[in-house]
Amino acid sequence: MELNTHNAEILLSAANKSHYPQDELPEIALAGRSNVGKSSFINTMLNRKNLARTSGKPGKTQLLNFFNIDDKMRFVDVPGYGYARVSKKEREKWGCMIEEYLTTRENLRAVVSLVDLRHAPSADDVQMYEFLKYYEIPVIIVATKADKIPRGKWNKHESAIKKKLNFDPSDDFILFSSVSKAGMDEAWDAILEKL
């Protein structure tokens, strides 16, 4: 599939399935804990500065945000998880919204699960990966902020993440930096393969 990634726009924000776009376009969901770099990932992948709002305040994305890419596919940004300053009730509401989307959306082709290369995956990261494996949803692990770690230590950090996740070697694992754009081509290859 040929994609003009510059031709991208935020389409709509949805709280439940009655608000989802009603068409057949394939979707790739982006999941990860708050401040893992999802907005930076979207902006880098689409060669845009501010298409997805980056925020110093974790937990800003509270709806499913659908991004139209060249009228051929969509990214769906789901609320960041694991942010403590959101009420338990609010977190449960997000959880139900995310679960409904991931388990019922026929357009969904795969989930890009973002983890921070600098840190061991959180319990939420592990739970998300196990959830995706349980529902047999194709998953691409993208380890963000690779530029914050010397290249010589990438393998060590990658191994630690894979071990904690009990990583399935048949899944894609991509080291990514929104600063240097390392991993961008590999991420697009993995995504397009799932469509």
From Swiss-Prot:
GO BP terms: division septum assembly
Pfam families found in the cross-reference section: MMR_HSR1 (PF01926)
Recorded GO MF terms: GTP binding; metal ion binding
PROSITE patterns, A to Z: G_ENGB
Classification via Gene3D superfamilies: P-loop containing nucleotide triphosphate hydrolases
GO CC aspect terms: cytosol
Residue ranges of domain EngB-type G in the record: 24-195
Sequence positions that bind GTP: 32-39, 59-63, 77-80, 144-147, 176-178
Keyword Nucleotide-binding (UniProt): yes
Residues annotated for Mg(2+) binding in this entry: 39, 61
Cofactor(s) needed: Mg(2+)
Segments forming a coiled coil: none
Keywords: Cell cycle, Cell division, GTP-binding, Magnesium, Metal-binding, Nucleotide-binding, Septation
InterPro entries linked: G_ENGB_dom, GTP-bd, GTP-bd_ribosome_bio_YsxC, P-loop_NTPase
Family the UniProt entry places it in: Belongs to the TRAFAC class TrmE-Era-EngA-EngB-Septin-like GTPase superfamily. EngB GTPase family.
Function (record text): Necessary for normal cell division and for the maintenance of normal septation.
Protein name: Probable GTP-binding protein EngB
Organism: Streptococcus pneumoniae (strain JJA)
Gene name of the encoded protein: engB
